[in-house]
């Protein structure tokens, strides 16, 4: 079994259906598969006449398999010396000749949120990638930390510099490489990250889980404000309140349906309840232009009744009545954009 492809010459690649790699400096070929709360791993060490098959269920199956393989190799096949581990990636120069900063550059350039390139792009399950984002952070000592998505059940990993744009897992033989550098906010940052045979891409800020959740929260607050302003004091028109209520129902329906079903169903199809909730935002998109027209007519009517200034409008109708309808329109547009972003 020989390597046929690699994402980057500095990291292990893939042969004919087998993933190439190293454990404690020893050559291994492996393959695995994971579904929701199920994990299987087959590993062969040809030079050691070793074969291992592990399969398990529940959310802890994947880390359990990794721990078992690590314990087995640490016990029966301890780490080789660097000179013996032929084929292992070595820095271009010893640590004595190259300082950590020279070997790795500025680790802060590598920090960010990444996601695997094996993901849906044009269907609604693209949103599942919100749950599978990896966060890379830089430490003051020049090392990197890799935080796995919450559902993976994997502990945070620490990576030490092993060359320019190259890092090694402190708990194993995995190599992390960064490539495809692009200018972001005036600084050169990598757009790709490779760990073994896995390829990752840097996530744009507007598609990170934190940005998406914060945006949904702000949008929901505006819609709740509109409904409450109409219920208590009629400080906005009924049209603004209805638009807010329709979108709140959509947000609650989408979130509720995704939380109510078993997680594994998300990997097969979009739930019917979610589809029903997604039918509400288009209705809101129809109401939004009507609200714009209503606001314009109201402003025109006030201009005819009196000499119009912002102060006069603020004192006769109140700031909420002036600003909130436009915020509702903006929030509706942001909600439609968000749904379009995630198909």
Task: Describe each region flagged by the PLM.
Residues 1-231:
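Catalytic loop of the DD-peptidase/beta-lactamase superfamily, centered on the K-T-G motif
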Residues 213, 229-343:
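Alpha-helical transmembrane segments forming the membrane-embedded cores
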């Amino acid at each position: 079994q020989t390597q046929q492809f690699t994402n980057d010459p500095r990291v292990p690649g893939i042969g004919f259906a087998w993933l190439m790699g190293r454990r404690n400096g020893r050559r291994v070929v492996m393959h695995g598969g994971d579904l929701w709360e199920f994990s299987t791993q087959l590993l062969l060490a040809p030079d050691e006449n070793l074969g291992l098959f592990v399969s398990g269920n529940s959310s802890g199956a994947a880390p359990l398999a990794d721990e078992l393989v690590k314990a087995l190799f640490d016990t029966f096949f301890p780490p080789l010396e660097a000179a013996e581990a032929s084929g292992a990636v070595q820095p271009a120069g010893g640590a004595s000749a190259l300082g950590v900063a020279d070997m790795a550059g500025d680790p802060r350039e590598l920090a960010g949120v990444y996601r695997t390139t094996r993901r849906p792009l044009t269907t609604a399950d693209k949103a599942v990638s919100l749950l599978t984002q990896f966060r890379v952070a830089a430490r003051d000592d020049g090392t990197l930390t890799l935080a796995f998505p919450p559902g993976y059940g994997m502990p945070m990993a620490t990576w030490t510099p092993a060359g320019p744009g190259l890092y090694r897992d402190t708990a194993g033989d995995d190599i992390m490489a960064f490539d495809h550098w692009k200018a972001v906010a005036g600084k050169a940052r990598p757009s790709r990250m490779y760990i073994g045979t896995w390829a990752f891409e840097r996530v744009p800020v507007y598609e990170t889980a934190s940005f998406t959740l914060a945006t949904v929260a702000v949008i929901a607050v505006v819609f709740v404000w509109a409904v409450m302003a109409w219920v208590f004091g009629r400080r906005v028109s009924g049209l603004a309140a209805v638009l807010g209520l329709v979108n709140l129902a959509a947000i609650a329906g989408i979130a509720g349906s995704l939380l109510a079903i078993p997680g594994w169903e998300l990997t097969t199809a979009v739930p019917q309840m979610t589809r029903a909730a997604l039918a509400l935002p288009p209705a809101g998109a129809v109401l939004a232009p009507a609200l714009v027209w209503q606001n314009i007519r109201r402003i025109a009517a006030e201009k005819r009744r009196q000499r119009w200034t912002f102060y006069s409008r603020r004192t006769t109708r109140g700031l909420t009545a002036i600003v909130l309808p436009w915020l509702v329109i903006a929030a509706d547009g942001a909600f439609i954009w968000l749904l379009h972003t995630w198909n």
